[in-house]
């Protein structure tokens, strides 16, 4: 069992590691990769992350969230940067309380607002 874990969430890939007796060990993904794609897809039946989300992305593009790490720490006052980042997303961006950023996705037939944090 690990005493501590480390998570490095990047815009494109996420790396997980844990501390073991012999040192730090990278946690392998379902496909035995040292990193997992930073992406989540929502279908009528399930939530998919990583490689599974990539596999369904073509048929479910509007409900597949990716690049959300690029929006962390931004708010609606960051107009120029938001305009640039919005070129990379296919889901709807909405303004929330306190000028926070939210993303509208359909999950199991219902609209939900998710935040990048």
Predicted region positions:
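N-terminal phosphate-binding loop and flanking beta/alpha elements of the actin-like ATPase fold
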Residues: 1-37, 42-117
């Amino acid at each position: 069992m690990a005493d501590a874990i480390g998570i490095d969430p990047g815009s494109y890939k996420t790396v997980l590691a844990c501390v073991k007796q012999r040192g730090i060990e990278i946690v392998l993904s379902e496909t035995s990769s040292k990193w997992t794609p930073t992406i989540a897809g929502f279908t009528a039946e399930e939530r998919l992350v990583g490689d599974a989300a990539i596999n369904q992305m073509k048929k479910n593009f509007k409900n597949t969230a990716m690049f959300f790490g690029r929006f962390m720490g931004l708010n609606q006052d960051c107009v120029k940067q938001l305009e640039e980042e919005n070129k990379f997303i296919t889901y709807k961006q909405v303004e929330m309380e306190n000028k926070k950023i939210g993303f509208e996705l359909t999950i199991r037939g219902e609209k939900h607002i998710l935040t990048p944090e």
